[in-house]
Amino acid sequence: MGAPKQKWTQEEESALKSGVIKHGPGKWRTILKDPEFSGVLYLRSNVDLKDKWRNMSVMANGWGSREKSRLAVKRTFSLPKQEENSLALTNSLQSDEENVDATSGLQVSSNPPPRRPNVRLDSLIMEAIATLKEPGGCNKTTIGAYIEDQYHAPPDFKRLLSTKLKYLTSCGKLVKVKRKYRIPNSTPLSSHRRKGLGVFGGKQRTSSLPSPKTDIDEVNFQTRSQIDTEIARMKSMNVHEAAAVAAQAVAEAEAAMAEAEEAAKEAEAAEAEAEAAQAFAEEASKTLKGRNICKMMIRA
């Protein structure tokens, strides 16, 4: 085991990034066994590498090491950067103060964008898997890094992604093998890619990925006139109506967040069990090899 609570050095972080570039995320044991990195990471375990990479790649706020980790993941697959591709959050009613903030946050240029069709999160997942074309499929970290790199995702994107991946696997749209996801051969990729790619053009954005207060499958894109109409309707509400709508939105958000959190916990538990089983299998294999060598020596 590694040394817990020991601060990571810059040299160790660089070795971890180089190892991920060379072997891919999730190959912690392979990175530790690689002579190129074992001399630097000898104090670290596969769990240490996994936790450090997760902290580097999915920090909740700011750029910092999160942006550095994105650059490291980007080097594993060469993708053309879609300039200014972003998704702005479409918020539900929460309070009068938030309504005022939403008014300023959703303002667009003098030329209002045309009406755009609904965008599904599963289309973005299919786009990521089809574009990366990794052998054996893509893991959750790689898929999330691709979507976050190409579009602006909400803070709770990791939990939404875990829930959506679990749903797509259960309904047969994705196949999960060794914590990697791939698209079955019978699934038409062109329709998914058209849905994911056809709506992200131009510099001004009012679209969004699902947040806890929106449906996990679809988010409606609104034109400026629709936004103005909605704001006018909100201003005409009395205090009791606004409070009731806000309370309902908060309740729906809490329910969605609880469901997503439960799904994320189940996924993490399954991942931990798989790693434990892999470690046990390796130890059992070593023991069996040792016994076979002893038997051969006795027979000789």
Swiss-Prot record:
Residue ranges for the DNA-binding region feature of this UniProt entry: 28-57
Residue stretches in coiled coil: 241-290
MF-aspect GO terms: DNA-binding transcription factor activity; double-stranded telomeric DNA binding; promoter-specific chromatin binding; protein homodimerization activity; transcription cis-regulatory region binding
HTH myb-type domain: residues covered: 1-58
Domain H15: 117-185
Assembly, per entry: Forms a homodimer and heterodimers with TRB2 or TRB3. Interacts with POT1b, TRB2 and TRB3 through its H15 domain.
Record text about domains: HTH myb-type domain confers double-stranded telomeric DNA-binding while the H15 domain is involved in non-specific DNA-protein interaction and multimerization.
UniProt function note: Binds preferentially double-stranded telomeric repeats.
Name this protein carries in UniProt: Telomere repeat-binding factor 1
Gene behind the chain: TRB1
